[in-house]
Amino acid sequence: MTQSKPKRRQGTRGARKPVKTTMADYAMSFERLGQWMSERARSPTLRHPQATSLSMLDGAVTAVVAGPVSMAPEEWVCPLLGVDPDAFNHDTEEFSAIAATLIRHNAISETLSTRPESFEPLFVRSSDGEVDTQPWCMGFYAVMKMRLLAWSRLLSPDTIEHDLLSPMGCVTVI
């Protein structure tokens, strides 16, 4: 007669948390990111983000991707989300927001580098169907201001880039 080992009790003791291995494992949903930014912008105690909506963040991330100079993530993510650089080092809600933002960055980068004609800015649409481009342009301009000197040659009226930036209203703001 063979003896069988006693079965281990099923329970939470000894249970392992799922291992997070990719940025997507850490990221909050894009919809949750919008709520998080809105809550943060209204908070009287937290550092306010420069991007207060998904549309504004989308414009900002697009400027980072399409801009004339590369920027380290800490340079643009921290001010846009209103977080400290230390947030990159912890498994917190702030890091989940950072991860979601970087995933959006990668998606925009992929689209603009492989299928630019399919890029669709995330504009705000009112209940009556009106499209409001202002938040997106404000986000784009927020990043331009971070590196205004680098952008300045693109804003010269003699360049094709000037003509491309003009419809967004970014040129008139400067």
Predicted features and spans:
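Domain-length accessory/inserted modules outside core catalytic folds
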Residues: 1-174
